Regions:
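Mid-to-C-terminal alpha-helical segments outside catalytic/metal-binding sites
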Residues: 2, 20-30, 38-53, 228-242, ...
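Sec-dependent signal peptide recognition
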Residues: 2-10
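Divalent metal-dependent hydrolysis catalytic cores, especially in the metallo-beta-lactamase
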Residues: 26-29, 42-61, 77-82, 103-109
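Histidine-centered divalent metal-coordination motifs
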Residues: 30-34, 137, 178, 246
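Catalytic pocket-lining loop regions of alpha/beta-barrel enzymes
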Residues: 104, 117-242
Length: 305
């Protein structure tokens, strides 16, 4: 490792700690960035107004710009590495994102095998080693170019694929995007038994369920239930949710629209404001604090691997 690279790594490590000194009002766990020009400045304005933090899901294409911006605004952005599980150099990519101070990986999607296939276990081992949060796409997968052949299957990304991962790596924090759309009941049940598994309800779920938001009371049903058949907890079942906007392609209107839909659903379900505060920021803020305390110091020798 050259002296210049070592200096850069040490600088990134020194700036990777949480810069916020108070619990923000909003943490968006699901914001994509692929190098779109000018978008980061616009996102920053929205985050400043909301007293928010965004997990910036950064592709290799967007990495140079995002990494610089995150270092300049560590109180508003946390880096996530947008990796492809089937890339032959994926472990090296994880090392690179970790060395840059990124705190998680995702959105993981469009894999050639099911998420819980043993072929991907070395990737989860590496994430576990670095205490990185994993964000998985769950449920139906979009098809933006229907005229082109694609090796993509909804079945590989079913939310039930996260159950084995959550059990096998009990210290990994896992977020399932989209609440498994349309497999909501399965999502709720595996979330109920896996304390390290959370969900966002970004995407189309809160659009198609707009006329029946109370439906989610049947998914998150176990609040205050005393039974040997469900984990003992004083927490609201809705605390399995965290906020995600799923902004992509620079469509920033979705940042505001997603918040409005979340609030409408939670209000219809009579979720207390104290619990809503956890969903919008408190739960994830607590996780980030624990992650920072538990994470090993960055290995400046990993570049020699």
């Amino acid at each position: 490792m050259t002296r210049a690279w070592l200096t850069l790594v040490l600088f990134l490590v020194s700036t990777s700690a949480l810069a916020q000194t108070h619990t923000p009002r909003l943490i968006d766990v699901h914001m994509h960035y692929d190098g779109e020009p000018g978008i980061l400045d616009q996102v920053l304005v929205k985050l400043e107004a909301a007293d928010g933090i965004a997990f910036l899901l950064t592709t290799p294409k967007g990495f140079p710009q995002a990494n610089k911006f995150i270092q300049e605004h560590p109180d508003r952005f946390i880096g996530f590495g947008d990796i492809k599980l089937d890339d032959p150099d994926v472990l090296h990519q994880i090392d690179r994102f970790h060395a840059a101070g990124f705190r998680g990986l995702g959105e993981i999607t469009m894999t050639r095998k099911p998420y819980d296939d043993p072929a991907y276990w070395p990737i989860y081992d590496r994430a576990d080693k670095y205490h990185m949060i994993l964000l998985f796409h769950t449920g139906i997968v979009n098809r933006l170019h229907p005229q082109e052949p694609a090796d993509v299957s909804f079945d590989r990304s079913r939310v039930t694929r996260l159950d084995l991962i959550a059990r096998h790596w009990p210290n990994l924090i896992i977020i399932g995007a989209h609440l498994g759309n349309p497999d909501y009941e399965e999502a709720g049940e595996i979330g109920r038994w896996n304390p390290n598994l959370y969900f966002d309800v970004s995407g189309t779920t809160l659009i198609k369920k707009k006329a029946d938001y109370r439906f989610f009371q049947s998914i998150f049903w176990w609040t205050a239930v005393a039974s040997p058949h469900t984990p003992a907890s004083g927490a609201s079942a809705f605390e399995k949710l965290v906020f995600g906007s799923d902004v992509f392609g620079g469509e920033l209107d979705e940042f505001d629209s997603a918040q409005a839909r979340y609030h409408a659903m939670l209000d219809d379900c009579e979720v207390p404001q104290s619990v809503q505060a956890k969903i919008f920021s408190g739960t994830m803020w607590h996780i980030l604090q624990l992650q920072q305390a538990q994470a090993p110091s960055k290995d400046v020798n990993q570049g020699k691997q």
